Amino acid sequence: YDYGMLGLDFGRLRAKYIHGFLESTENDINRYITARGIEWTNRKSLVIGLSETVIYSGEDRPLDIGYINPISTHLEIELNDRLNTLGTGSANAVWQISGDWLINQKLRISANYLFDEFVLDKIEFDNGKEHGKAYSGRISYTPIMSETTLLTTYFSLLTVGTPTFRHGNGYNNFVQRNKPLGWQYGSDGQEFKLGLNYFNRTNLIAQFEFGQRKTGEESITSRPYDPYADYLAGPFPSGIVEESLFITSKLQWWWRPSIQLNGGVDWDDNGS
């Protein structure tokens, strides 16, 4: 999609803002995306970030100047009626905290946690309502690091909740042209992976992954523009669950400085 971006770098502190146009649907609904984030680093081994991403839409809706201010937030804009449309159902926001920690030259940990819907009222919790959320984590270890070989192993986990990335107005879902924004399998799912990366530091890169994936019937990939049914807690993944084991491998080889050969294999058992 087309977007404009503003970035600021103050050394240990960095900030970034984007505003873009996602698409116009067949019934003249214009859809936009805007995001702002701030990141702190110790310039050695640690990066911590906070971000907010918003999708807003409306029939023949123009670019909303309420979101032009890079330091404004979705809740502040919406609750103070600064949008170019009435009400509080014309936009959908998610908030994310992330971290990346290089413990030493061989060990690295990264993680992300995303909120889509906050549930703060005890009554709502008692009625079975839950946060809309997603999270991921990765641990990588480099047992071989020499002048001729770089070998890294890793384990990763990713979970996206059942109603996450959906909205009461389906045109504010995190999708573009029927494809999810984010994890390619949408939502209502979980994935584990073990992987291996190899680089001979000259002309060969190889990657191998093995993992398991589970997706439920409420994934945003099946009904991209439908609103969520509710935020009530339930079995996860929901409904009929599709489970699969998968293996992927990729290879890049520079045979000559001007000739590169690429190859890959993707396999899964497509079980359910």
What are these regions (language model features)?
Residues 1-49:
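Internal, well-ordered domain-core segments that constitute the primary functional module
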Residues 46-50, 54, 59-272:
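Exposed, low-structure sequence patches enriched in small/polar residues
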